[in-house]
Curated annotation (Swiss-Prot):
Phylogenetic classification of the source organism: Bacteria, Pseudomonadati, Pseudomonadota, Alphaproteobacteria, Caulobacterales
GO terms under cellular component: cytosolic large ribosomal subunit
Domain of life: Bacteria
Family of this protein: Belongs to the universal ribosomal protein uL6 family.
SUPFAM superfamilies in alphabetical order: Ribosomal protein L6
UniProt subunit comment: Part of the 50S ribosomal subunit.
UniProt organism field: Phenylobacterium zucineum (strain HLK1)
Record protein name field: Large ribosomal subunit protein uL6
């Protein structure tokens, strides 16, 4: 069983953490994030560390302990460094371009696909076949990347589609004559 909950979350200088009941608010140079911790978990701040402990020994408390610690750590990292996800477009004529704040993609459909960024997310297209998604909320960055990938997932025969940078797409052999 994982014991990640025992590890304290280090709070770097320039980051302020406010604990109000079960709500943890983290403010940093890149922005502010808030999250409500489960009732089974107790949160306290000692100096430059955030400590989480279980209120009881239930199975749910054990599960929420490690999860809560990781989510609070993700918040601290998000407001200091931020998160970034890179997508690649593979295929003839597949390209992306910025249209104001929104992302406009040609993915082999009869029309362009436009995606507006959710609050707190920014898009960038360093190359026509590359999309960078960045923000302070790790979960929202990953969800936005998955939503864009879902528009045209990589297919197994030619490998065309939208894929994560470094993703290994399993290829299949075509029909034999």
């Amino acid at each position: 069983m994982s014991r990640i909950g025992k590890k304290a979350v280090a709070v770097p200088s320039g980051v302020t953490v406010t604990i109000d009941g079960q709500t943890v608010t983290v403010k940093g140079p890149k922005g502010q994030l808030a999250w409500t911790v489960a009732e089974e978990i107790e949160v306290r701040q000692e100096g430059a560390e955030i400590l989480l402990s279980k209120r009881d020994e239930s199975t749910r408390a054990q599960a929420m302990w490690g999860l809560s610690r990781t989510l609070v750590n993700n918040m601290v990292v998000g407001v200091t460094q931020g998160y970034e996800q890179t997508l690649e477009l593979v295929g003839v004529g597949y390209r992306a371009a910025m249209k104001g704040q929104a992302l406009s993609m040609q993915l082999g459909f009869s029309h362009d696909v436009d995606v507006a960024p959710p609050a707190g997310i920014t898009f960038a297209t360093p190359k026509q076949t590359e999309i960078k998604i960045s923000g302070i909320d790790k979960q929202l960055v990953g969800e936005t990347a998955a939503r864009i990938r879902r528009l045209r997932p990589p297919e197994p025969y030619k490998g065309k589609g939208v894929r994560y940078a470094g993703e290994n797409v399993r290829r299949k052999e075509g029909k034999k004559k």
